[in-house]
UniProtKB/Swiss-Prot annotation:
It comes from the Eukaryota. It is found in: Plastid, Chloroplast. The gene is SKL2. It holds the Pfam family SKI. InterPro entries: CS_dom, HSP20-like_chaperone, P-loop_NTPase, Shikimate/glucono_kinase. This is Probable inactive shikimate kinase like 2, chloroplastic. Keywords: Chloroplast, Plastid, Transit peptide. Residues 1-71 form a transit peptide. One of its GO terms (cellular component) is chloroplast. GO terms for biological process: response to stress. Belongs to the shikimate kinase family. Disulfide bonds: none annotated. SUPFAM superfamilies: HSP20-like chaperones.
Length: 387
């Protein structure tokens, strides 16, 4: 996935690939091979009150990590211990061989978002860990490693020292844990042409984040005592869109919710003039594409964003799907979180700005929020942005 400074993040998700084979990153062009630093013993390591992370409570010192992602981590199971010490993170890998290795038998290759650790054994270079999806960016030139008995210790300096890493790699578990500190309670809206896709992706997100799942289709049908299809036949799509807009207004003050919106022409999100209350949360546009490669999908999304012919182009992030399989809903949800993570990291003031927008009444002045007392119906000229 590519991320752009304009705030548009795009994920291209192909069913022929494993979930999130590309993700939003602001990549550094430099790639370095870190230099080893060998210490004589554990006492040489300056500890900084690191805590041990475990997604599940495991009594052993080491967590067992297994991943089948094509571009996340090598498929072999590895034992590791991960700690986040603020500005730095530390990874401890248990070496496969029982012999004491010399630095020349170890290879550590790192760049801004990737890490490859290999061990020479019987003349062969064995991969201990290989990922191009570290949870976030590191400073490659600050990476050091050393051997401590039967463990390889890799110490990396984070680019963003304030961001807490739940784990060394970006995964569903680390994203759902890490996004809580970034979202700060802000809600998420899933928009796009397919109501079914919106529903399934939003449910996965709600479960993962511990948010409340809300479905505008279910709310509308419960209120009207009829199906959406019957409503459209009886009163037309405009009536349904207006009704959903009212529902979104009532939900705009809610926090920690994932809202699934109606797809198609009868959905409010597809209409550019109905986004006043959608701006209260982070919006993810899930869109199917016939593009056969990531670059084509990015260009397609970029054109849609620039032309603004449909309401979906107002979304904060875009997830492009090459085909759809309901069993892959969690993969799309993970891709959505990855894009949102990069968006918020690029501008950490966004959650607070969303909150301010809600407090001022969701007046439609996103992203250039006007001062208190501004009335869109009597606006006669430009106003300074209120932050």
């Amino acid at each position: 996935m590519a991320a752009f400074a304009s705030g548009l993040a795009i994920i291209f998700n192909s069913p022929s690939l494993n979930p999130v084979t590309t993700q939003a990153t602001f990549l550094s062009s430099n790639r370095i091979r870190s230099s080893p630093r060998v210490f004589s013993g554990f006492h040489s390591l300056r500890r900084r009150g690191f805590r041990r992370f475990s997604q599940n409570v495991i009594p052993d010192r080491f967590n067992s990590f297994s991943c089948n992602c094509l571009s996340a981590v090598s498929t072999s199971t590895i034992d590791y211990e991960f700690t986040d010490g603020g500005k730095e993170v530390e990874l401890r890998l248990r070496l496969k061989t029982g012999e004491i290795l010399s630095p020349k038998d170890i290879s550590v290759d790192a760049d801004g978002t990737s890490l490859a650790v290999k061990e020479k054994r019987n003349g062969l270079l064995i991969t201990l860990l290989e990922t191009n999806h570290l949870f976030e960016k590191i400073m490659p030139s600050e990476t050091i490693w050393y051997i401590d008995e039967d463990q390889l210790v890799v110490n990396m300096k984070k680019v963003d020292g304030e961001l807490k890493w739940p784990d060394i790699v970006e995964s569903w578990e680390s994203l759902t844990a890490g996004m809580m500190q970034l979202l700060k309670g802000a809600s998420i809206y899933i928009v796009g042409d397919s109501t079914e896709i919106n529903q399934k992706v939003s449910r996965e997100l709600a479960v993962g984040l511990g948010y409340s799942p809300l479905d505008s289709k279910e709310l509308l049908e419960s209120f009207s005592k009829q199906t959406i299809d019957s409503w459209i036949l009886a009163e037309g799509p405009d009536s349904v869109a207006e009704a959903e807009s009212s529902v979104l207004e009532s939900l705009s003050s809610h926090v920690r919710t994932v809202v699934s919106t109606l797809g198609g022409k009868h959905g409010a999100a597809g209409r550019a003039d109905q986004w006043r209350h959608l701006y209260s949360g982070f919006t993810v546009w899930v869109s199917q594409t016939e593009a056969t490669d990531e670059e084509s999908a990015k260009e397609e999304a970029r054109r849609s964003k620039q032309e603004r012919e449909i309401g979906y182009s107002n979304a904060d992030v875009v997830v492009k799907l090459q085909g759809w399989d309901p069993t892959h809903a969690k993969s799309v949800a993970q891709a959505s979180l990855s894009a949102l993570k990069q968006l918020i990291i690029s501008d950490k003031g966004l959650p607070g700005k969303k909150s301010l927008y809600i407090r001022l009444g969701c007046r439609g002045d996103w992203p250039n929020i006007k001062p208190p007392g501004w009335d869109p119906s009597s606006d006669t000229g430009p106003h300074p942005q209120f932050t």
